[in-house]
Amino acid sequence: MLGRALIRTFLSPTVPVAACTTQIAGVHHHKEAGDMKRFTGVTRSNKAKANRNTHVNEKLFRKMRGRKTLLVELPEDSARERESEMPPGEMRTELLKRGLNPYKEAQPRVWNEAQVTFQSIYGIADPYVPPETPASFTDVNNKFDEVKQRLQHKFYNWRMGTNRIRKKQGFEKFDVKTFCAKAEDIYERAHKAMEARDKKEMYRCITEYAFAKMWPDVENGSVRFELVSIVEPSRVVAVRCFDNPPKSGNDIAQITVRMHTRQKLALYDRFGGLILGSEDEEKDVVEYVVFENHIAVVDGEWRLHGKIYPKWIEPKQGTHITHQLTQKEAGVQVAKANALPLRTTEKLEEAKKEKEAANSS
C-alpha cells in the first residue's frame, strides 16, 4: 500500500500533489480500532475459545498460564472438627496413616499458664549503682566517665523519680530522707514473715517477683533470721518511676536503698541439715535492696522487690554441704579404685544349677 502511493506521486509530475502516507497496523489484536466488532468484543480473536480475551496463539502460552495456578490440598471442615476432638492416641494414628511423624513434624499440644499482674514489674528498672569509692585521677578517661555517669544518675533520680512520684495523688509530700526508716521496717518484717511461712504477711511486705525467689527457701526447708543492729544509716541511691504497659499511666516506682546491717542468718534443708550461715555467728552485710510501689493507686504500699549485686560486693558464703577441698584434704584423698563385690559369677552358677534342676525334674 505504501509503495503504490509513492509510485503514483513519481509517475504524475505535472500535478503537484503532496506525498501522503497512511500507516495501517497489520497486527492481529482484538483491540484494533480498525475493527469495531473486535474492539467492542462482539467477535472473538480465537473463535474456538469462549473467552474473547484469549491470546491468538493459545498453545504457545498454555504451559506458562498453567504454572500460574497452584493446587493446594485443603482438608474439609468436617475433618478439621474431627481432628480437634481427637485424643492424642487417635491423632498420632491418623498422622501415621498420612505418612507424617507426629513427633517430628507435628508439635504436641502443650498448655502453658502464667500469672500476669500490672501492679508490679517482673524485674528491676535500673540496676546501676554508683561505685562506693571514686576512681583515681591517674586515668582521666575513666574519671570523666564516672563523673558523667554520676551526674546522669542524679538527674534521672530527680526527673524520672522524685519529681514524677510527687505528681501522683497521695504522694505530694514524698521525701527520700524519711523513706529509709520505712525501708528498714519493711525489710525486717519481710524476713520475719518468711521465717514464719506467713504468706499473707509476705504478700503485704514483698512483691510477686520477690515471692517467687524467697518462697522456695522455706517451702522445702527453714530459715532463721535476726536483725541485730544497723551499722550505718541507710541511704537512697536510686529512684525510678515508669509506667507498665508503656504510655498507659499505670505508674510504678522503684527505690534502691543501701543497707549496712549486722544480722544472723541460717538456712536449713528439709531434713534439718545446715546449708548456709549460722544462728550464732553475726555478720556485717552490705545490701542494695529495691523497694517497689504501685503509685497509680492511692492506697499503694511500699514492698520489698529484689536486690542488686554490684561488681564490688563480696560473693556469698558457700554452702556447708559442698565446699572446695584444701590442699591438705586433697592430699589425704585416695585415688585408687576398689573392686566392688558384684558376685556376677556366683549368680550365673546359681542360675545354671536351677536350670539343670528344672530340666532333670
From Swiss-Prot:
GO terms for cellular component: mitochondrion; ribonucleoprotein complex; ribosome
**Could you tell me which Gene3D superfamilies the record lists for this protein?**
3.10.450.240
Entries under Pfam families matching the protein: Tim44 (PF04280)
The protein's UniProt keywords, in alphabetical order, are: Mitochondrion, Ribonucleoprotein, Ribosomal protein, Transit peptide
Q: Which SUPFAM superfamilies does the record cross-reference, listed alphabetically?
A: NTF2-like (SSF54427)
Sorted alphabetically, which InterPro entries does this protein's record hold?
Answer: mtLSU_mL45, NTF2-like_dom_sf, Tim44-like_dom
List locations, semicolon-separated.
Mitochondrion
Family from the record: Belongs to the mitochondrion-specific ribosomal protein mL45 family.
This chain belongs to the protein called Large ribosomal subunit protein mL45
Instruction: List the source organism.
Output: Caenorhabditis briggsae
Encoding gene per record = mrpl-45
